[in-house]
Amino acid sequence: MTSSGKIRIYELSKDLSLDNKDVLDAARKLAIAAKSHSSSISSLEANQIKDFLKKSNTINTTIKSSKNLDKQILSVKKNPVKTQKDQKTEPKKKNHDQTELSQAKLNTLLKPSQTLIKSQGSSQANNQKALKNKFPAKQQITSPSKPNKPLPPNPRVEVKPIISKPLTQAERAIPQSEQKKDGQFINQPKRSELAKKSIGQPKQINPQEPKRPLAPPSRPKIDIQDKKPLQPNNQKAKTRINQGEISPQKVGQGNIQKIKSQNKQNAPSRTPQPPTKGNTLELVGAPIRKEKPVNKPHTNEVRNKPVMPSRPGAPKPPTAANRQGLSNRPGSNNRIGGTGRPGSPNRQGPNRGGVANRTTQGQNRPGANNRAGAPVRSGSPNRGGMQNRPGVPTRSLGGPNRSNNRPGVPSGMRKPVAPSELMQLQKPQARPNAPQRKTDSPTSLRPKRENSTGARPPVNRPTPAAPKKPAHRPGGTAAAPRRTGRPDWDDSAKLDALRNKSPQKQRQKVHIIGENDDALTAERGGFAGEQQAVVLSASLARPSKPKVGKRNNGKPLTALKKRKKETTRQRQRRRAMELRASREAKLVRPEMIVVPEDNLTVQELADMLSVESSEIIKSLFFKGITATVTQSLDLATIETVAEEFGVPVLQDDVEEAAKKTVEMIEEGDLKYLIRRPPVVTVMGHVDHGKTSLLDAIRKARVAAGEAGGITQHIGAYQIETEHDGSTKKLTFLDTPGHEAFTAMRARGTRVTDVAILVVAADDGVRPQTLEAISHARAAKVPIVVAINKIDKEGSSPDRVKQELSEQDLLSEEWGGDVVMVPVSAIKGENIDKLLEMVLLVTEVEDLQANPDRLAKGTVIEAHLDKAKGPVATLLVQNGTLKSGDVVAAGPVLGKVRAMVDENGSRIKEAGPSCPVEALGFSEVPTAGDEFEVYPDEKAARAVVGERATDARAARLAQQMASRRVSLSSMSGQASEGELKELNIILKADVQGSLEAILGSLEQLPKDEVQVRVLLSAPGEITETDIDLAAASGAVIVGFNTSMASGAKRAADANGVDVREYEVIYKLLEDIQLAMEGLLEPEMIEEALGVAEVRAIFSIGKSAVAGCYVTNGKIQRNCRARVKRGKQIVFEGDLDSLKRNKDDVKDVSTGFECGIGCDRFANWEEGDQIEAFKLVTQRRKLNN
């Protein structure tokens, strides 16, 4: 019991001596919430469960079943009859209660504890088990739905049977056949369980011993008044039994008395035994071999054969009517007392368990030759075959479940032929409709197959060898007749033999007759007809391959000769043609490739560029890079290779950044939507006139005040224009065109409604133009093309249209759907037409928003102002932003203190599609994040807290990435101390500039110098930054920012290098120069002159060369290289230089001199002396 006074399920089950699942089952029925054995319930609920279990007598049943466990071995509990006292006191059970009892009993039958086999037992216990085994079919009628249900208690009927010998082990192994196989129950015949007694040890059971009816009161009964067993024509009764309407218990009572009468006689007889009662069923089976192991249940499951009822009108002995054993194999005979297995000796005495008498097989198998005098052993156990038991579903191994009492096959279908007849001589007859054959003898039975259970597994049934050379196969097409007039050595005869090899193999197989054979023989003309015998498994009854018609004996075999095997030369020629075709298909180069995750293998890059991988490897080899087809390339290398093939490269994550991810309009806004101004983004290549076009639209001069004449920020403006007699508002976003500001362009595309693509008429389509097109397509926004600079000389708008058409942007004038307007930003031509086209396109888009809700939108740009603090440029996309609103922008929380429009005027609220600068954020938000206004600060803080954790993890990952040094870049340099690092601290004015600079730094080569960004943040340079730079030896780089008070003095005192830039070009160039300054200078050769040896003077052991200077001049103590022809014979220092026996420093062109080297004296006339010196040179980064 818990501290709160509740009781756990396992405690309650322990008190009640029950399993946890029983208590959980009761709780579920009482609608008490209990999920597992450790769940807690109240005392009231525990008392309800106890009362429920006491009413259902589950506790008593469990205790009693544990005590009588030895008496329940391999038995199926029947539903005992209640006494008169119980019938008076207990209410009548409903049908569904009986179903639950049946299911519980079936579960009891399958428990492992009841499958144990005991070697000894008392006769009284065995007799009681025999009574319980009379009714196994009752539990099998109802499919089990709740197998774990406990057994409800029922009073047992004490029966005093006649004492006889104890049961054998084979009897106690019967219920093992009813185990689970492949998720289904293989139900054994009811009579086979009673017939498992030994012939020499019969049991006498008095069927009239119980005084009360054995079936439950609510179960309907049926009286079988026919003297015969159940026949196929009695379909109504069989159907009722199969459907569970009729209890088969009375049928089982007759079996007991029949066994008693048969065991008394215990003699073989061919005549049927007279029944003692009208409702009895007769049992005929094979005797049991005692030496057969009894603990293998698969012997019962594998040796089952379906019952084949007799054909209407055919005589049928009542004792062996429903007996069906194993099928007769080809060449096997039915012998008296033998098993009839081909290839095995016939034994006298009882048959093996599970193997039926072959006499009954011959009677039930069509076309079998039954020998006269083969006795029917009455009273022998029927372990092998499935009996005609009503209501018990059977399952064939490998086949579907079917009813035992299957209706007979229509008369138009051909009857199956026994395998023994397949191998016999038959007269060739033309039987296209496959008529039925007459019975071979008046005593042979040809019953229709009623409860066929499919094919038997061939594991325990070895296939006998069929005759390899049958005497004659009339009408068969398996073996073609030998061609006449051809010698034995003829090749065609050998080809015939090879061709007929496969049918001969088929002929050696044994046909397994299944339940689908009737339909198949009707379709194929019979097994023993004109066509070849078909070997078919009943569980794999599928449409066979179409048969080849009869071949004309007179025609030569030419079809096989035409099939020539492909030679090696033909295969090589075919492969060369396929390779040539694939290369021709790859000649078309793509306009642009998208690189996912900043790396590609050589093979992937070759596929994208539509070139061979060897071309990529050759290109890299010329750059000093050894690569294989599986080696990964970084983005810089990919761009270098792609430039050689004239294909620009675009990063995949940049295109993903342009996609719209958040839907600003919610379901609750649909009723209050109104039209909103469109958001237009101006995009294009650098210096194509985007800002000048906006200046012409706004009638301002923004471009004149930009540093370097290029845009480095994203600007947002709102203008008003006249359209259709009314004033329309347009919101414009100006994006940078430089390649470093890719993220800015993607951010602008994500919030836009229409994209204006500016293309210079004199420059055409450029890389950033292609990137802008990809951004617009990723955001799924319409494109309006503005062909600018039409007033310049050499401009060609038609050429621009042609280049754009290659990018699937076809002008309306050429039959496309893209609006293209030629404009001049300087002269203001066609500006009004451009605005009109933009408004027309946006009207089609039907842009709407709900102004009467809390604002939602996107952070376009953000920066840190030294006077105002964090400032964010916000674009309201839905709702209205007001002063005082609590805003959460990503992980940053803020409260709007003031809002300023693009002109610097203060405003109190901003509606949809309105760009504003908002003040009041706790820190600088990240550009590109979505912002949302919350009703109170508490709700906003809850959202911001979760986002801050994610942002902190992302920031840490970025810092680790900045310190990452790849193994390939380190190689052997780290061990030699040659790996250099450049530490920088980056401060910029806005967040977008930081993104652009960091992205550009990533593109710099890092093979020998690693750029390590210690800190990157928007805002001015402070004293804290100076201290960090002094401690780490870093360089401070400022972009469009200023230094705080005291920072300049601190930098001078600490000797920190602070660089300030306004244009990104200069910043990146200086950082690259600083990286190159860290590299060790390299030594290069500088040529001085060339001299020719014309005479040789020996001086002691050494020699001096008399030379003539032909080019340049020769200096003393310089480096010299002696070449003899094309071979270098010496390279070293020039130690002595004389002219007219005087030492000189140098000798110019046209003069003679004497040259001597201390380490070389092997001069020859005609040698060339090249003089050079080594000088140091500043190294550059390897691109």
Swiss-Prot record:
Residues 544-553, 560-574 have a biased composition (Basic residues). InterPro entries: EF-G-like_DII, IF2_II, IF2_N, P-loop_NTPase, Small_GTP-bd, T_Tr_GTP-bd_dom, TF_IF2_bacterial-like, TIF_IF2. Residues 788-791 are annotated as: G4. It comes from the Bacteria. Residues 709-713 are annotated as: G2. Residues 684-691 are annotated as: G1. It is found in: Cytoplasm. It holds the Pfam family IF2_N. Residues 734-737 are annotated as: G3. GO terms for molecular function: GTP binding; GTPase activity; translation initiation factor activity. Residues 83-99, 220-229, 288-304, 485-499 have a biased composition (Basic and acidic residues). Residues 675-847 form the tr-type G domain. GO terms for cellular component: cytosol. Residues 824-826 are annotated as: G5. SUPFAM superfamilies: Initiation factor IF2/eIF5b, domain 3, P-loop containing nucleoside triphosphate hydrolases, Translation proteins. GTP binds at residues 684-691, 734-738, 788-791. NCBIfam families: IF-2, small_GTP. Belongs to the TRAFAC class translation factor GTPase superfamily. Classic translation factor GTPase family. IF-2 subfamily. HAMAP family: IF_2_B (MF_00100_B). This is Translation initiation factor IF-2.
